[in-house]
């Protein structure tokens, strides 16, 4: 439905890591930065990062203090340290080139199932199933009729996502990006724009009357947490 409606072609955001000219390293950096950080905050940092360290080899030898400073207020600065560890592993194990093989990607420091699948799909065109929070929410609503997915990804969810992917590799990778974009822009956690959704006519959640979630999600407190303290220290 996403492809038949042409929704993604019209509404996809023009993000630099989606450009055909973006290197696999650029895609990897974007995926790490986008973990729990909005696109609007990532964009300027991503550009600065790639200008300063355009290859894994460049980041591998950078002073750690410089890496943390450049990460600035993206939050969760441990991600910056893990990214540098991954860069060093890429240099040591893969001659400085980000590997295409999902298993090799998962073996890098700080790279889990999702990030490995995303890099394999978006950087190398390998039809891995990419399931993030946005994808889980779209599938939960459109297929299962649930307002929100559970707290943790289940095997059943993963099988469902895999079954929905087109068989053609090119379409499968476009599908990954399209469903993620739909969840980010339309099928949002709060106040979804169902009137603008290309899946609304067949959405199980809409058909059920858009019932509220069984469990209302609660955000993590900020004031007084270790994250707040770390952010204040880095900003000083």
List PLM regions with ranges.
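Catalytic cores of DNA base-excision repair glycosylases
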Residues: 6-228, 236
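Short, small-residue-biased leader/transition segments that mark boundaries at the very start
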Residues: 1-2
